[in-house]
């Protein structure tokens, strides 16, 4: 890793009023190498941040402003976009043209093919006209543990989704080394309600989701295509898998369980644990649990950690991989700051929490 850049990085947070934006404000405000230069948010334009968020006062109070590309370019080195899908693509080309590096938390640049994005995000494609084919090709997928070299040289990072982060952290080591069959992979994931965002949503009302668990997006969830794209990249051929998300009555956290068939049925759980440990050696945010101990979302809450466990079912030759993340940190804002650290020439873990408050 390169030495720390002496200059403090100036960060514009665009879309600061959502849950992802709130996490970003906290992380950047407390970061030793970055400062908040601009806070944009359509909900509270003209109001001071500390006035509308008394529970999260920042060191240097900022007024919420509308996005003005020229003003952002004057006082920002980086812009982190925490915006709805489609909207980021309307600002990103303008920011890049002004020399501002962009980290995008939406799905707008997660596909190398703009046509594929339009196929997956049909409603957004109808609403926002896009012709930025070259930027889709240029963008680096921000899975920090695997693409750090590319991230360090890039001006545009497509930060992964929360479900893909949890699921790909399990799949990549085994697909890249050809240790599992690429057919018949099942990804079963559970998420807390904050993954649905801060806007009103009947499904996320307390009386609707409390004391209940339910699947959604069973066939064709948008993250399926994202997981398959990156899985195919590491497998070296097309991967078609089954992904089913579930909503559980908690605020934050994701549990992802992956089922796949081992190419070598003689591999044990200990063997597979060694594979993961070797693959993620020296990665500060990946924790591998002993065989027989299974991860809980509470163990990573309010951290940027991924906690992984593995089992092998000898009866059918299947591997069972489990991971937990905090969907708002490692699954969103924390991973963005991890990528920002890499872009700025810092160690990837600076300014990011590693230990939960427990219980």
Curated annotation (Swiss-Prot):
The keyword Amino-acid biosynthesis applies. The active site is at 162. One of its GO terms (molecular function) is NADP+ binding. It is found in: Cytoplasm. It is an enzyme of class 1 (oxidoreductase). Its main location: cytoplasm. GO terms for cellular component: cytoplasm. Its EC number is 1.2.1.38. SMART domains: Semialdhyde_dh. SUPFAM superfamilies: Glyceraldehyde-3-phosphate dehydrogenase-like, C-terminal domain (SSF55347), NAD(P)-binding Rossmann-fold domains (SSF51735). Pfam families: Semialdhyde_dh, Semialdhyde_dhC_1. The keyword Manganese does not apply. Keywords: Amino-acid biosynthesis, Arginine biosynthesis, Cytoplasm, NADP, Oxidoreductase. GO terms for biological process: L-arginine biosynthetic process. Pathway: Amino-acid biosynthesis; L-arginine biosynthesis; N(2)-acetyl-L-ornithine from L-glutamate: step 3/4. It catalyses: N-acetyl-L-glutamate 5-semialdehyde + phosphate + NADP(+) = N-acetyl-L-glutamyl 5-phosphate + NADPH + H(+). NCBIfam families: argC (TIGR01850). Belongs to the NAGSA dehydrogenase family. Type 1 subfamily. Catalyzes the NADPH-dependent reduction of N-acetyl-5-glutamyl phosphate to yield N-acetyl-L-glutamate 5-semialdehyde. This is N-acetyl-gamma-glutamyl-phosphate reductase. The lineage of its organism: Bacteria, Bacillati, Cyanobacteriota, Cyanophyceae, Synechococcales. The gene is argC.
